[in-house]
């Protein structure tokens, strides 16, 4: 383990207790660690002391990414892997009998996450020093470890093999031959050389050079540049999919599927359900033909029972079958993760049962499922539940014994908790927010519903408070952006519901307000209250106010636990002479996350880099990408999106210089409800919190800008705008003639917006003629008006799609529409109407170039940004 810190506070005791429990084979242990006490550090130390492989279970991808990043730093020389769901978008197949609606399966797989999953299983099979950070997706089925291992083969220099046999083995492992588009999971052949891009590697591939039927050389190279990076003596090639199946197993599975289909068809026909029988036979036989021909089919996971050789009701093969018996499982935020594991099975079972009942799938599809809680409990190795608020199951399994980690290494104590009446909670919150902002800290406000969050945000915005809201309608990348901007000080208050809880690291937060704290429920339970109170525990001046008209049991227990921890922490600090200090963490930590690789689409205004990184070549590359998006949107006739991207490009180019000096510059022109005078005061308040060095830097920047503007004003302007007297006075000669005169409004019709040489101001071909010009006083034939060279278009000529010359004289009458002779004399047949009709767009995907998946995603996402008034 690599770290600059040594265990402090309660950490040494907790590490010792947990290591003793592992040595004594205690199956379940509990680590009760408060927010900011270094639970991740303790887990890493336990792994180092026990020298065992470990699986870290996180409740969501955000915390999984955070843990992955931290363990990567703690163990740079070991195999730290990431195993989460690889779907960017997933719509499972389903049937709604009430409306007779069948929804096809639709998904989008993230290549980067898929590669990391392959890397995780490979590390488990090859190494002992493995740490896997996983989400709850690890209890879902993947390929059998026996089959996956059996399909693996090794090659080394000097081996003799047939080239055709090697290519056949690669195809059996579901590698694809790509002679041109050489990507992960593919291979190509060039004479006696075979190049393989393994499924678990990102920027390296292998070149197998053969002499006849003997392997002469194995080279590692960069697939992008072709540059050689190393020489290898042997390589082990793993399958391109966890669901790969050997041909004998596949043939046996096809026989079993046909047998089940035969029995199921007899059942449906006896019940008189002929439609379901016909549907099931058609769909299943198509899948069987695909399996026989290619070894795979769409929805192959529904036949996983036969492909893995399991019996009905057996647990599916999961990541837990790859984990060695001596491994440790750390369940992070166990009060959330454990109920998640228990809740995955039933919803999945109900959906698949409906599909089987109505003939869309065979009944065996219900064996493609996540683990039941009982199966997971029986399968898990030695476990440590880590939480500030352990649940009932964890405490029951550990016999009520737990390792406590209440003392923080920084000496911070839990924030004081105060109860105030809820009748005037909003006005009281506004006053507290102003005091907190004046001290330079941020505020978190938690409410009960999305509507309350948005309404409270609007009200605070009207009161002159810089505020945002965050709830489940906000896109995940937008949430990261909001948290980063809150820490930067771009706004002062964040209103949320259930997202302001586990794992939220905001050391700048000095005040947490919990509105309607007496409304009993899962949002105001003892666990939720303690977790929310913990958000203010990273700041030495943090405080929490519960707004309630009565003290509920959950509030009483939460305050009692918080006070117990405060007393213990204060005693420790007094005994050891520790002065508490706020937690310091880099703002970029929240963005340096593998979690961002789990997204492929984001709104154009969402930036995953910090402001300082969006400069120079990075900004240029970003602008180039946005310009490509703009052109693509225009090509797809989505002109509104193209215009938004164009405006964003323009704004970024204008901000390039200012962002490099001031990270808050992009909020300088943000809409504000207060007047200009108050706005100036508010900006002064922001500047007040800057250090002397920052204020000096901004002063020099302002002086440089002022000097540049003065120099620009001193230079002669060849293209200056003419003054009013120059534009309206007849015959007036300006003191300084510009090279180009601005035409009048009357002369600025279509096709007339051309500049006029300054020397011919009075001879303008586009200006309205004065009285002297009409009598030819300046040039031309005396007494005759001067005719312009270009005629001004009339209204008829300026209409849309009227570029032809208007017809002189009488316009011919419109001919009668042609009627079909078959319909002559019949009143029920209407003549065809040749008049222009509006273009009616069909639904997405019908006779058009639009992507139905994109259309559904646009309908599903409300596109909220957390800003008031949007």
From Swiss-Prot:
Residue limits of the Helicase C-terminal domain? 425-591
Q: Where is this region: Disordered?
A: 671-698, 741-870
**In what residue span(s) does the UVR domain sit?**
620-655
Q: Which domain of life is it from?
A: Bacteria
Q: Which GO terms describe its cellular component?
A: cytoplasm; excinuclease repair complex
- Ranges of Basic and acidic residues composition bias in the record: 793-808, 827-836
Under the heading SUPFAM superfamilies, the entry gives:
C-terminal UvrC-binding domain of UvrB (SSF46600), P-loop containing nucleoside triphosphate hydrolases (SSF52540)
Helicase ATP-binding domain residues: 20-410
GO annotations under biological process?
Answer: nucleotide-excision repair; SOS response
Keywords assigned by UniProt, alphabetized = ATP-binding, Cytoplasm, DNA damage, DNA excision, DNA repair, Excision nuclease, Nucleotide-binding, SOS response
Q: Which InterPro entries match?
A: Helicase/UvrB_N, Helicase_ATP-bd, Helicase_C-like, P-loop_NTPase, UVR_dom, UVR_dom_sf, UvrB, UvrB_inter
The UniProt entry, under PROSITE patterns, shows: HELICASE_ATP_BIND_1, HELICASE_CTER, UVR
Binding-site residues for ATP, renumbered to this chain: 33-40
Compositionally biased tracts (Basic residues) = 679-689, 858-870
**Subcellular location, record wording:** Cytoplasm
Q: Where is this motif: Beta-hairpin?
A: 86-109
Alphabetized GO MF terms: ATP binding; ATP hydrolysis activity; DNA binding; excinuclease ABC activity
Q: What is known of its domains?
A: The beta-hairpin motif is involved in DNA binding.
Q: What does this protein do?
A: The UvrABC repair system catalyzes the recognition and processing of DNA lesions. A damage recognition complex composed of 2 UvrA and 2 UvrB subunits scans DNA for abnormalities. Upon binding of the UvrA(2)B(2) complex to a putative damaged site, the DNA wraps around one UvrB monomer. DNA wrap is dependent on ATP binding by UvrB and probably causes local melting of the DNA helix, facilitating insertion of UvrB beta-hairpin between the DNA strands. Then UvrB probes one DNA strand for the presence of a lesion.
The family line of this record is:
Belongs to the UvrB family.
Q: How does the record describe its quaternary structure?
A: Forms a heterotetramer with UvrA during the search for lesions. Interacts with UvrC in an incision complex.
Protein's name according to its UniProt entry: UvrABC system protein B
- Gene behind this chain? uvrB
């Amino acid at each position: 383990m690599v770290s600059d810190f040594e265990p402090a506070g309660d950490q040494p005791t907790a590490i010792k207790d947990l290591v003793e429990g592992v040595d004594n084979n205690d199956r379940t242990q509990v680590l009760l660690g408060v927010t900011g006490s270094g639970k991740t550090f303790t887990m890493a130390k336990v792994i180092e002391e026990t020298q065992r492989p470990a699986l870290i279970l996180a409740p969501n991808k955000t915390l999984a990414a955070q843990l992955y990043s931290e363990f990567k730093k703690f163990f740079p020389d070991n195999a730290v892997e990431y195993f989460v769901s690889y779907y960017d978008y997933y719509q499972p197949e389903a049937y709604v009998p009430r409306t007779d609606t069948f929804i096809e399966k639709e998904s989008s797989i993230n290549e980067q996450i898929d590669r990391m999953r392959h890397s995780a299983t490979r590390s488990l099979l090859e190494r002992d020093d493995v740490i896997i950070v996983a989400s709850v997706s690890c209890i879902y089925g993947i390929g059998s470890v026996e089959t996956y291992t059996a399909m693996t083969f090794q090659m080394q220099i000097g081996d003799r093999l047939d080239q055709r046999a090697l290519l056949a083995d690669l195809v059996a492992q579901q590698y694809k031959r790509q002679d041109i588009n050489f990507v992960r999971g593919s291979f190509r052949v060039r004479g006696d050389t075979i190049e393989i891009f393994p499924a678990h590697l990102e920027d390296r591939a292998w070149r197998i050079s053969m002499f006849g039927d003997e392997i002469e050389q194995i080279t590692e190279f960069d697939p992008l540049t072709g540059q050689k990076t190393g020489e290898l003596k042997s390589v082990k090639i793993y399958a391109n999919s966890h669901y790969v199946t050997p041909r004998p197993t596949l043939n046996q599975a096809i026989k079993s599927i046909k047998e089940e289909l035969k029995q199921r068809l007899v059942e449906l026909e006896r019940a008189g359900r002929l439609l379901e029988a016909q549907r099931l036979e058609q769909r299943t036989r198509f899948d069987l033909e695909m399996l026989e021909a290619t070894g795979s089919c769409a929805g192959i996971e529904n036949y996983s029972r036969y492909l893995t050789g399991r019996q009905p009701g057996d647990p599916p093969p999961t990541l837990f079958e790859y984990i060695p018996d001596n491994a440790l499982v750390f369940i992070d935020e166990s009060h959330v993760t454990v109920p998640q594991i228990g809740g995955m099975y039933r919803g999945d079972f109900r959906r698949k049962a409906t599909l089987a009942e109505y003939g869309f799938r065979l009944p065996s599809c219900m064996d493609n499922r996540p683990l039941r809680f009982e199966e997971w409990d029986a399968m898990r190795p030695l476990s440590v539940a880590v939480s500030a608020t352990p649940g009932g199951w964890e405490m029951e399994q550990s016999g009520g014994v737990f390792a406590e980690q209440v003392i923080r290494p920084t000496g911070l104590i839990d924030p004081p908790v105060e109860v105030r009446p809820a009748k005037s909670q909003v006005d009281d919150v506004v006053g507290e927010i102003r005091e907190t902002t004046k001290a330079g800290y941020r505020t978190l406000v938690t409410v009960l519903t999305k509507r309350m969050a948005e309404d409270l945000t609007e009200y605070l915005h009207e009161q002159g408070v810089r505020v945002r809201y965050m709830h489940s309608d906000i896109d995940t990348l937008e949430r990261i952006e909001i948290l980063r901007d809150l820490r930067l000080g771009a706004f002062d208050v964040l209103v949320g519901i259930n997202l302001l809880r586990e794992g939220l690291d905001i050391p700048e937060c000095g005040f947490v307000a919990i509105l309607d704290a007496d409304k009993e429920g899962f949002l105001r339970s003892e666990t939720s209250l303690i977790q929310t109170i913990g958000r203010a525990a990273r700041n030495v001046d943090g405080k929490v106010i519960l707004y309630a008209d009565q003290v509920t049991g959950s509030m009483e227990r939460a305050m009692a636990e918080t006070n117990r921890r405060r007393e213990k922490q204060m005693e420790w600090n007094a005994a050891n002479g520790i002065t508490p200090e706020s937690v310091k963490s880099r703002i970029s930590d929240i963005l340096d996350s593998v979690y961002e690789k789990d997204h492929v689409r984001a709104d154009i205004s969402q930036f995953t880099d910090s402001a300082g990184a969006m400069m120079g070549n990075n900004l240029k590359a970003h602008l180039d990408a946005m310009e490509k998006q703009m052109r693509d949107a225009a090509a797809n006739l989505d002109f509104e999106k193209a215009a938004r991207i164009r405006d964003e490009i323009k704004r970024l180019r204008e901000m390039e210089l200012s962002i490099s000096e001031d990270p808050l510059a992009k909020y300088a022109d943000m809409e504000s409800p207060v007047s200009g005078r108050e706005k100036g005061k508010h900006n002064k308040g922001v500047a007040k919190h800057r250090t002397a060095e920052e204020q000096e830097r901004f002063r020099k920047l302002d002086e440089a800008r002022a000097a540049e503007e003065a120099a620009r004003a001193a230079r002669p302007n060849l293209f200056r705008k003419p003054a009013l007297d120059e534009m309206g006075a007849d015959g007036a000669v300006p003191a300084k003639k510009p090279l180009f005169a601005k035409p009048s409004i009357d002369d600025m019709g279509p096709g007339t917006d051309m500049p006029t040489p300054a020397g011919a101001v009075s001879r303008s071909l586009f200006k309205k003629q004065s009285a002297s010009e009409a009598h030819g006083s300046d040039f031309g034939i005396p007494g005759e008006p001067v005719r312009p060279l270009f005629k001004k278009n009339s209204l008829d000529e300026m209409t849309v799609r009227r570029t032809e010359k208007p017809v002189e004289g009488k316009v011919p009458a419109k001919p009668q529409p042609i009627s079909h002779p078959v319909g002559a004399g019949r009143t029920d047949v209407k003549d065809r109407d040749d008049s222009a009709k509006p273009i009616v767009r069909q639904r997405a995907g019908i006779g058009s170039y639009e992507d139905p998946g994109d259309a559904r995603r646009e309908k599903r996402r409300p596109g909220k940004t957390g800003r008031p008034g949007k």
